[in-house]
């Protein structure tokens, strides 16, 4: 079977090659000529699978190592007998890890305890669900807002956004970008919402889609003191981000929240599982697909006099590292994404020197203890 894979999809080499004829191409080398005889494509979101690319080719399955699938023309695929599969939830833990580590940084800077804060999670899909799990393990109180799920499931445990504004110290957004009513999310973080935050002054986090937030409204909100802190990973108009907003954000990163090595491995694995599902092609070495171990896999809590859970989390990922890089060179936003050294998730780290209570919390967040 002929497969063409994007060269930036990791961990495929040595697993696919023994059982299929696979070619690795950089995304800008994908063309009707280079993929003409491929039955399967393995791509990321940078490769646009449009009629201009697919017409006249032998492609019958497109797999993407990403949760998102806006880069695939689904209508064209359906009308031309081309199946497609995405990788839902592949980086959900990575995004939740990002949020928790950002909150740890803010807690250390401001001197508050996260256990005293109420977190509001807007959008409770794969990512929101993982964030709920980690926050619960940590011992945080949380409220959930997901209007489409509330409507579909008739579940009154989901609250309206206005209730989160009234009760939450932290509001983290994990919604898709949609323009269609009744649950449009475009500029959901807009002037009206931000003005309503003025009394409670929450920490606001956007780690979903840039255009979920109105850039100019965010700038006004920070300047007006409506927010305690602002964390931004996703930006309107990226890679050409607004420099005024960059200056005002407390933590600013170049859309890397989901970029863990584990998330990349999950995406690659799910692509190969889709090929097996559709064509029956088995990959005997699939069990070996795994990211490399972290450079420093042992976390010794005895080295830290206080804030030990926060220090353990920040050992896995410190958002101030990409924050400093972005502030130093905002014009290289895309280059920083491409060169980003993908961190490992918590399950790759062993914690020693923990108390019984700390060990229970850390195990709940996937650490080995």
From Swiss-Prot:
The keyword GTP-binding does not apply. Keywords: Cytoplasm, NAD, Oxidoreductase, Pyridoxine biosynthesis. GO terms for cellular component: cytoplasm. Catalyzes the oxidation of erythronate-4-phosphate to 3-hydroxy-2-oxo-4-phosphonooxybutanoate. The active site is at residues 209, 238, 255. GO terms for molecular function: 4-phosphoerythronate dehydrogenase activity; NAD binding. It catalyses: 4-phospho-D-erythronate + NAD(+) = (R)-3-hydroxy-2-oxo-4-phosphooxybutanoate + NADH + H(+). GO terms for biological process: pyridoxine biosynthetic process. It is an enzyme of class 1 (oxidoreductase). Substrate binds at residues 45, 66. Gene3D superfamilies: 3.30.1370.170, NAD(P)-binding Rossmann-like Domain (3.40.50.720). The lineage of its organism: Bacteria, Pseudomonadati, Bacteroidota, Bacteroidia, Bacteroidales. HAMAP family: PdxB. InterPro entries: D-isomer_2_OHA_DH_cat_dom (IPR006139), D-isomer_DH_CS1 (IPR029752), D-isomer_DH_NAD-bd (IPR006140), Erythronate-4-P_DHase (IPR020921), NAD(P)-bd_dom_sf (IPR036291), PdxB_dimer_sf (IPR038251). Belongs to the D-isomer specific 2-hydroxyacid dehydrogenase family. PdxB subfamily. PANTHER family: FORMATE DEHYDROGENASE 1. Its main location: cytoplasm. Homodimer. It is found in: Cytoplasm. This is Erythronate-4-phosphate dehydrogenase. NAD(+) binds at residues 146, 233, 258. Pathway: Cofactor biosynthesis; pyridoxine 5'-phosphate biosynthesis; pyridoxine 5'-phosphate from D-erythrose 4-phosphate: step 2/5. Its EC number is 1.1.1.290.
């Amino acid at each position: 079977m002929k497969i063409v894979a994007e060269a930036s999809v990791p961990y495929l080499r040595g697993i696919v090659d023994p059982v299929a004829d696979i070619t690795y191409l950089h995304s800008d080398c994908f063309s009707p000529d280079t993929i003409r005889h491929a039955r399967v494509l393995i791509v990321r979101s940078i490769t646009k699978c449009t009629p201009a690319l697919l017409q006249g080719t032998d492609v019958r399955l497109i797999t993407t190592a990403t949760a998102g699938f806006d880069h695939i023309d689904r209508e064209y695929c359906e009308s031309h007998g081309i199946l497609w599969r995405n990788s839902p939830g592949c980086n959900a833990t990575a995004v939740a890890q990002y949020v928790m580590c950002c909150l740890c940084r803010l807690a250390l800077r401001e001197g508050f305890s996260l256990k005293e804060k109420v977190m509001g999670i807007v959008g409770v899909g794969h990512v929101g669900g993982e964030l709920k799990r980690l926050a619960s393990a940590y011992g945080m109180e949380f409220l959930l807002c997901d209007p489409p799920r509330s409507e579909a499931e008739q579940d009154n445990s989901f609250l309206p956004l206005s209730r989160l504004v009234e009760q939450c110290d932290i509001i983290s957004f994990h919604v898709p970008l949609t323009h269609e009513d009744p649950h449009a999310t475009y500029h959901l973080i807009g002037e009206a919402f931000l003005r309503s935050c003025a009394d409670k002054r929450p920490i606001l986090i956007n780690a979903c889609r840039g255009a979920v937030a109105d850039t100019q409204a965010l700038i006004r909100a920070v300047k007006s003191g409506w927010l305690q802190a602002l964390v931004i990973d996703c930006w309107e108009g990226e890679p050409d981000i607004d420099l005024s907003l960059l200056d005002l954000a407390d933590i600013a990163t170049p859309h890397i929240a989901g970029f863990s090595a584990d998330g990349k491995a999950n995406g690659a694995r799910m692509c190969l599982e889709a090929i097996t599902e559709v064509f029956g092609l088995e990959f005997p070495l699939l069990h070996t697909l795994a990211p490399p171990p972290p450079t420093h896999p042992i976390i010794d809590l005895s080295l830290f006099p206080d804030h030990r859970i926060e220090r353990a989390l920040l050992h896995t990922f410190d958002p101030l590292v990409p924050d400093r890089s972005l502030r130093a060179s905002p014009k290289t936003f895309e280059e920083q994404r491409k060169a980003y050294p993908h961190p490992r998730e918590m399950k790759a780290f062993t914690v020693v020197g923990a108390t019984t209570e700390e060990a229970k919390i850390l195990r709940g967040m996937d650490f080995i203890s």
